[in-house]
């Protein structure tokens, strides 16, 4: 009888150990579901936001402020507010086309082809980065490849592989907050596997029921003389009314 009681205890201990071992696996949702949750936080039908972009060089830094109106991932209108040198510069995105108006020359130019890879006002962001605002679920396949702690937050590490051809980055690696479903770190890679850019997200706040990082620090790994670019959203409103007239070339000169 004693042996039988001991066997039961051992079996219970094994079952408990097994259940504890598989618990983390059960708590991890599929990679596609994680991407969907990220999209729900970061994407919206439309949004209006004010931001500051601080470009850090080896000798000095400069800050540019702007206001952006965006509808989905196809249309956006940005007006730069300061400093005086950039004030009045406007950027219009319609589908796959991008125009920039310069008040100093009173000219509107279209940015296309290889020009899209150029830096935006000397920052670590390219025009391609500003153009592509599609949902991650529409453009990448995902796989959970590990876990790591970032800034005291438990994260899943997601490996993203492009599933459409027209991507600036063939693959990405995301460190996703396991509780809030927002990326806290990201690495962007070329088709060759070379690391092109790295970004870190912080100041995550809840806005209108969604978690959103208000600050992103970008680093172009190939850009010489750059100490990185900080992008901070100072005010944002989701799903608000936006005047239709903004999304026309005529609005650039108004």
Enumerate the predicted regions with their spans.
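N-terminal, post-signal-peptide region of Sec/Tat-exported proteins
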Residues: 49-85
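Flexible, processing/modification-adjacent segments and terminal tails
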Residues: 28-46, 52, 61-62, 87-90, ...
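Gly/Pro-enriched, hydrophobic low-complexity segments
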Residues: 107, 131, 153-249
């Amino acid at each position: 009888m004693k042996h039988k009681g001991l066997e039961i205890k051992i079996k219970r201990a094994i079952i408990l150990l097994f259940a504890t071992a598989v618990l983390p696996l059960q708590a991890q949702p599929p990679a596609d579901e994680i991407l969907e949750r990220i999209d729900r936080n970061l994407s919206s039908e439309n949004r209006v936001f004010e931001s500051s972009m601080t470009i850090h060089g080896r000798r000095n830094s400069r800050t540019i402020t702007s206001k952006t109106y965006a509808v989905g991932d196809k249309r956006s209108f940005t007006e730069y507010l300061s400093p005086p040198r950039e004030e009045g510069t406007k950027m219009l995105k319609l589908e796959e086309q991008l125009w920039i108006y310069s008040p100093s020359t009173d000219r509107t130019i279209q940015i296309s082809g290889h020009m899209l890879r150029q830096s935006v006002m000397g920052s670590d962001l390219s025009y391609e980065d500003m153009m592509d605002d599609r949902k991650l679920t529409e453009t990448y396949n995902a796989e959970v490849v590990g876990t790591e702690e970032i800034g005291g937050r438990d994260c899943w590490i997601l490996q993203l592989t492009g599933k459409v051809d027209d991507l600036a980055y063939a693959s990405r690696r995301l460190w996703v907050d396991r509780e809030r479903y927002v990326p806290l770190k990201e690495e962007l890679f070329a088709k060759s596997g070379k690391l092109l850019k790295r970004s870190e997200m912080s100041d995550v706040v809840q806005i209108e029921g969604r978690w959103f990082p208000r600050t992103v620090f970008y680093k172009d790994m190939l850009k010489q003389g750059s100490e990185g670019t900080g992008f901070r959203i100072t005010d944002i409103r989701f799903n608000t009314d936006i005047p239709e007239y903004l999304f026309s070339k005529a609005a650039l000169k108004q």
